[in-house]
Amino acid sequence: MPIVTVVPAPPPVNFHNRMAVRVAALMAVMATLLFFLPYLNWLAAGFFAALLYRRRTGYLLSLESGVRLGWITGVLMFVIVTILLTATVALVTASGGFSALPPEVRNALDPRFQEAMKTLQSGPAIAELLVMLFMFITLLSMAGGALGAKLSGRGQGPVV
């Protein structure tokens, strides 16, 4: 009689999967540190989250699972970016805004930056910015997760 080994089904990729959340959180922090590369860092976070998940667990990710892992990474990145944005706006507002800065400093700032900070002083503009950030961060991270799942090595193990 042949010996049959039963391989347990890999855990689904969601917020209940501790390894998936750990990998996503690590990539979210790393991508946030690369804030000077917008769009590319969000795409890369999803991509490397899928590769790191594959490496740590040994499970191949299906395209759907890669998108889910990218989405988890994107949501965590959005939370981090929102906290940083809120802290920045609160600090600037508490110190009297940009009008409290010395004229030399105000004139040295990029005019686009000055205009953006004036815009961020209205509630609807902040809400619009947050919605756009959520869309960009999560969609690019999901695309990166799908790409990472696709390129992480087909045919080498069970697909999650």
Task: List where the protein language model places each region.
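Selective recognition of hydrophobic, aromatic-rich stretches within alpha-helical transmembrane segments
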Residues: 27-52, 81-96, 122-152, 156
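Low-complexity, intrinsically disordered extramembrane tails and loops of integral membrane proteins
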Residues: 1-18, 154-160
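Short hydrophobic alpha-helical membrane-embedded segments
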Residues: 14-28, 120-121
